[in-house]
Amino acid sequence: MGGGWWWARAARLARLRFRGALLPPPRPRSGGARGSFAPGHGPRAGASPPPVSELDRADAWLLRKAHETAFLSWFRNGLLASGIGVISFMQSDMGREAAYGFFLLGGLCVVWGGASYVVGLAALRGPMQLSVGGAAAGVGAVLAAGLLWACAVGLYMGQLELDVELVPEDDGTTAAEGPDEAGRPPPE
């Protein structure tokens, strides 16, 4: 049960999609088209792209789902490592030192999964048949998930928590002996 089959499929789709851009332009066979860069000249003038078949749509959908599954796997592993960090954080002082390692491991998993998702999304947007808006929504969702994870871990470790301590000011002078605002005498 290998997991690398979809990389081969993604590479094939990318090769088919970018083959025209990577190959050198064909040389003209007749001298009539030489030197003309105006649109409307040449053998492919007015040729529309081939229609997208159901098989192409299914391939794009499968590639998107495999790509999202890879990110979710990394994110799940990051959450699992962070959960182990929370458990060890509560154990003892030695557990707190181990917890920082688990939080770091969880962060590496979340960051690596998010970065590989964003890079893969940028590289395979064409074969996935994603619009720019769809790709931007995917990137936004990944960034939001990573930010929520970072905020949760930061709040748990107390890094973002503000400790406000109310300390009465004592400048060395005592209040005048006399009744307070309610008219009661001072305590003895």
Curated annotation (Swiss-Prot):
The chain crosses the membrane at residues 102-122, 135-155. Residues 25-52 are annotated as: Disordered. The keyword Transit peptide applies. Keywords: Membrane, Mitochondrion, Mitochondrion inner membrane, Phosphoprotein, Transit peptide, Transmembrane, Transmembrane helix. It is found in: Mitochondrion inner membrane. Residues 1-96 form a transit peptide. Residues 29-38 have a biased composition (Low complexity). It is a multi-pass membrane protein. The modification Phosphoserine is found at residue 48. Its main location: mitochondrion. GO terms for cellular component: mitochondrial inner membrane. InterPro entries: TMEM160. Belongs to the TMEM160 family. PANTHER family: TRANSMEMBRANE PROTEIN 160 (PTHR16236:SF0). This is Transmembrane protein 160. The gene is TMEM160.
